[in-house]
Amino acid sequence: LDDRAGCAMLLAMIREELPCDCCFSFTVQEEVGCFGGKTAAYTLRPDIAIAVETTTAGDLAGVPEEKKVCRLGNGPVVSFMDRGTIYTYDLYKRVRALADAHNIPNQTKEAVCGGNESRSLMTAAGGSEVLAISIPSRYLHSPACVADEKDIENTLELLRLLPEALAL
């Protein structure tokens, strides 16, 4: 599912009439240096960039509470920070408030871990405001990756609200 679920959600949005101009980038080589994100930043020069991906849930029996980064069934994960990026705090607050205002369950990562293309988008080509919205998943990077269908639906619902809410 990593990052096919994110691609599927973006493809659904591309088919819709959006209230403002949006660019969608399907990048490569995230796991080996975020090279696709850097190329996208130089090509598109976005004001705001949102990484849509999956993140490790770790909500399994026997895993200590401090290692449970997020939980399946609690909605999309809106991160404030990971190993490569400190996300735009105002953007983080606005997206969490937007989800709450629309009764979309959401959560934040409870540990600083992982990383994604945001680190390249934040710094390349003059940088942009960045945020990551992730689907909590178990067994990430394996053929048995598991996600909650409701989390995927709630993530897409939140993503659909962003173009109008964040339009510059």
Report each predicted region and the residues it spans.
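Acidic, glycine-rich active-site loops and adjacent beta-strand->loop/helix elements
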Residues: 26-33, 54-56, 137-139
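Short glycine/serine/threonine-rich phosphate/pyrophosphate-binding segments
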Residues: 4-8, 33-36, 115-118, 142
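Alpha-helical metal-binding/catalytic segments enriched in His/Glu/Asp
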Residues: 1-31, 155-162
